Curated annotation (Swiss-Prot):
Taxonomic source organism: Danio rerio
The protein's name: Histone chaperone asf1b-A
Sorted UniProt keywords: Chaperone, Chromatin regulator, Nucleus, Transcription, Transcription regulation
GO cellular component labels: chromatin; nucleus
Gene: asf1ba
Assembly and interaction partners: Interacts with histone H3 and histone H4.
Keyword Ribosomal protein: no
């Protein structure tokens, strides 16, 4: 059984201008004292076509963590616009929150993000080069995709079964309009569970 349960993630400052920081209020519970840190990350998927455009916006270590319920606000700067392909700047993408313990990812929470112009003229006739100052980011907070992975919480050298800690299925969270190209996002994995918070 997992020693950490994520109870809630609240998306703050949503919708917001593209350049605003991402803010998530994360509530989790530890079933027992954890002697080592939890590592939380926020990852922005810059393009569904290649992982090379994924940006780790921030990473924070929390711990050691005593048993009980905990809450913190995780804030990360907006992605570096120069690292996003111009063709992927407007439209739907994904932001991921991951958590690892002893180097093993045990939960991945994904949200669809829609980047669009608020100005009607720009929406109907978008500029060839994205105008990030005019883009609004809207996170679909009501429908997160959650994937849980079985990990070895004790940190022993014994190996977990291969099917219990594998990457999610390819393209499981790509919007229907995207063509398959990589497997950056969430999906169902045997012996793991995926649900909504």
């Amino acid at each position: 059984m997992a020693k950490v349960q994520v109870l809630n993630v609240a998306v703050l400052d949503n919708p917001s201008p593209f350049g605003n920081p991402f803010q998530f209020e994360i509530t989790f519970e530890c079933m027992e004292d954890l002697p080592e840190d939890l590592e939380w990350k926020i990852i922005y998927v810059g393009s569904a076509e290649s992982e090379e455009y994924d940006q780790t916006l921030d990473s924070v270590l929390v711990g050691p963590v005593p048993a009980g319920r905990h809450m913190f606000v995780f804030q990360a700067d907006a992605p570096n616009c120069s690292l996003i392909p111009e063709t992927d700047a407007v439209g739907v993408t994904v932001v991921l929150i991951t958590c690892t313990y002893r180097g093993q990812e045990f939960i991945r929470i994904g949200y669809y993000v829609n980047n669009e112009y608020t100005d009607t003229e720009l929406r109907e006739n978008p500029p060839l080069k994205p105008n990030y100052g005019q883009l609004q980011r809207n996170i679909l907070a009501s429908n997160p995709r959650v994937t849980r992975f079985h990990i070895n919480w004790e940190g022993c050298a014994e190996k977990m079964e291969d099917s219990e800690n594998v990457d999610p299925a390819p393209n499981a969270m790509l919007p229907p309009s995207c063509t398959p190209g990589k497997a950056p996002l969430l999906g169902l994995v045997p012996d793991n569970s995926m649900d909504c918070l």
